From Swiss-Prot:
One of its GO terms (molecular function) is RNA binding. One of its GO terms (biological process) is symbiont entry into host cell. Belongs to the avihepadnavirus core antigen family. This is Capsid protein. Self assembles to form an icosahedral capsid. Most capsid appear to be large particles with an icosahedral symmetry of T=4 and consist of 240 copies of capsid protein, though a fraction forms smaller T=3 particles consisting of 180 capsid proteins. Entering capsid are transported along microtubules to the nucleus. Phosphorylation of the capsid is thought to induce exposure of nuclear localization signal in the C-terminal portion of the capsid protein that allows binding to the nuclear pore complex via the importin (karyopherin-) alpha and beta. It comes from Duck hepatitis B virus (isolate Shanghai/DHBVQCA34). InterPro entries: Hepatitis_core, Viral_capsid_core_dom_sf_HBV. Keywords: Capsid protein, Cytoplasmic inwards viral transport, DNA-binding, Host cytoplasm, Host-virus interaction, Microtubular inwards viral transport, Phosphoprotein, RNA-binding, T=4 icosahedral capsid protein, Viral penetration into host nucleus, Virion, Virus entry into host cell. Homodimerizes, then multimerizes. The keyword DNA damage does not apply. SUPFAM superfamilies: Hepatitis B viral capsid (hbcag) (SSF47852). GO terms for cellular component: host cell; host cell cytoplasm; T=4 icosahedral viral capsid.
Length: 262
């Protein structure tokens, strides 16, 4: 990957959360962009990675939504005097990345016990579900940003998306009174390029070759008796003189002047 594209991809993580579409809208837009490539069995880098994130987000999103629904339904059976587990006792996303998946439940259970050894079982399940759902949501946010990057690279081109992220970051980091009212859009950035490409497609005629061309004579000439004569002009009737003889005089000089000697 180009160094500028790599930097732009890293900057995607710093963009505001509300810049990106909601999960449902994002997946739908990504599928629309990927459908032509799926039909042609394309193996482009952006197609493969975007397809992976579409599948990942759909699975994670459904699982996370299920966790939230179960956790909410458990609230009715949790004793009303039970205090919620503080955030500091719940495993965070950064910690979960360092813990093997099979040990995640054990680590979270140990933290709940350290908070309150006799914590009610229903409240424990609720705490587990809330912790796992939070981890999934943060993973989904990262996957959502990456999916946005890859399917937009298919739609607009990697160079255009890189340019757009750079301009957007500059606009966001500029104090409000020194910047334009509206943030830059990728459509506005790519419109001049599309217009130029469209103009080239509709132009008629042959393309002029690069470099210098040999200068061509409009009228081809030849040399006759030391004089240059155009081939495009009418040729006179051949004169009866021999080759090398003097040229005939004009019609006005055909008759000799009378000789002074008779």
């Amino acid at each position: 990957m180009d160094i500028n594209a790599s930097r732009a991809l890293a900057n995607v993580y710093d963009l505001p959360d509300d810049f990106f579409p909601k999960i449902d809208d994002l997946v739908r837009d990504a599928k629309d962009a990927l459908e032509p490539y799926w039909k042609s069995d394309s193996i482009k880098k952006h197609v493969l990675i975007a397809t992976h994130f579409v599948d990942l987000i759909e699975d994670f999103w459904q699982t996370t939504q299920g966790m939230h629904e179960i956790a909410e339904s458990l609230r009715a059976v949790i004793p009303p005097t039970t205090a919620p587990v503080p955030t500091g006792y719940l495993i965070q996303h950064e910690e979960a990345e360092e813990i093997p998946l099979g040990d995640l439940f054990k680590h979270q259970e140990e933290r709940i016990v350290s908070f309150q050894p006799d914590y009610p079982i229903t409240a424990r399940i609720h705490a587990h579900l809330k912790a796992y759902a939070k981890i999934n949501e943060e993973s989904l946010d990262r996957a959502r940003r990456l999916l946005w990057w890859h399917y937009n690279c298919l739609l607009w081109g990697e160079a255009n998306v890189t340019n757009y992220i750079s301009r957007l970051r500059t606009w966001l980091s500029t104090p409000e009174k020194y910047r334009g009212r509206d943030a830059p859009t990728i459509e506005a950035i790519t419109r001049p390029i599309q217009a130029a490409q469209g103009g080239r497609k509709t132009s008629s005629g042959t393309r002029k070759p690069r470099g210098l061309e040999p200068r061509r004579r409009k009228v081809k000439t030849t040399v006759v008796y030391g004089r240059r004569r155009s081939k495009s002009r009418e040729r006179r009737a051949p004169s009866p003189q021999r080759a090398g003889s003097p040229l005939p005089r004009s019609s006005s000089s055909h008759h000799r002047s009378p000789s002074p000697r008779k």
